[in-house]
A protein has these predicted regions:
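N-terminal auxiliary segments of SAM/dcSAM-dependent transferases
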Residues: 3-110
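Solvent-exposed amphipathic alpha-helical surface segments
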Residues: 36, 40, 134-138, 191
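Short helix-to-loop capping/linker segments positioned immediately adjacent to catalytic or ligand/cofactor-binding
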Residues: 41-48, 137-139, 206-207
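Short helix-terminating capping/connector loops at secondary-structure junctions
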Residues: 47-49, 141-144, 194
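Active-site catalytic microenvironments for nucleophilic, acid-base chemistry
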Residues: 61, 65, 165, 190
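Active-site/binding-pocket entry motifs
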Residues: 64, 120-121, 222, 229
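SAM-dependent Rossmann-like transferase core, predominantly class I methyltransferases
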Residues: 73-74, 80, 84-167, 174-186, ...
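S-adenosylmethionine
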Residues: 168-170, 174-234
């Protein structure tokens, strides 16, 4: 037997046991993922509340299945290549401790989907709910807002929600990070809002155009360096 044959034989034996061989259905993989996440001590605070919800989301996303329809697929058998994809995702979450949003490359605020990656903080803001109501009662008529600013825009998610909440507004979205603005530009383009949202690279107001604003919103990173040391790995 050649060295190459020996390596191939070892690879075949690896697949005779373990999750790739023993876990067959979506239900099997869901149970396995929940156990792995719990044993790894994963933190859940980026839109999904526990190991089960995150396992459902990651498995359905990996298999390109509807995120709101688990039941019809629970006992579906998963081909070998897709099992490998699921195992890779589970390991990224449980071993590498990557947040689910960075694994899938997306995050949701309400019905709005946004691209995210490690260049930006994962969207998670109570401002989203306020913007759904046009920031009532502080703003009586959303259509009267014609100029608004999102300071520390990050992925651009709040600027995009502002554009929908205030249909007559032009939005200035500001961030100190060009990497973050690059992500924001992709999200803005995905919603066709390039004509209404202007991205500005600025340290605070330093490079912001001199103009008046009807509405200014800011949801900056608010964790101190000391607090960062005690945060979960995610």
């Amino acid at each position: 037997m050649t060295h190459e044959d020996h390596l191939e034989d070892e690879h075949d034996h690896e697949h005779e046991h373990g999750p790739l061989a023993e876990l067959v259905t979506v239900r099997d993989w869901l149970r396995y993922a929940v156990t792995r996440f719990n044993r790894a001590g994963c933190f859940f605070g980026h839109g999904l509340t526990d190991a089960y919800d995150e396992a459902v989301y990651l498995i359905l996303h990996t298999l390109s299945l509807p995120l709101d329809r688990l039941e019809p697929f629970l006992d579906a058998c998963i081909p070998g290549d897709e099992r490998e994809e699921i195992l890779e995702v589970i390991e990224k979450r449980a071993t590498d401790r990557l947040p689910a949003a960075y694994i899938t490359g997306e995050a949701w605020l309400g019905d709005f989907r946004f691209k995210v990656d490690p260049r930006v903080i994962i969207p998670r803001s109570y401002f989203a709910e306020l913007l759904e109501d046009g920031f009532s009662p502080w703003i009586q008529d959303p259509e009267t807002v014609t100029a608004a600013m999102d300071m520390c825009t990050g992925s651009g998610c709040l600027a995009i929600l502002m554009a929908h909440a205030f249909p007559n507004a032009e939005i200035v979205a500001v961030d100190i990070s060009q990497d973050a603005l690059d992500v924001a530009a992709e999200n803005i383009a995905a919603y066709g809002l390039e004509d209404r949202i202007k991205l500005v690279l600025s340290d605070g107001f330093a490079a912001v155009p001199e103009q008046g604003f009807d509405f200014i919103l800011s949801n900056p990173p608010y964790v101190t360096r000391e607090s960062m040391e005690s945060l979960p790995a995610e």
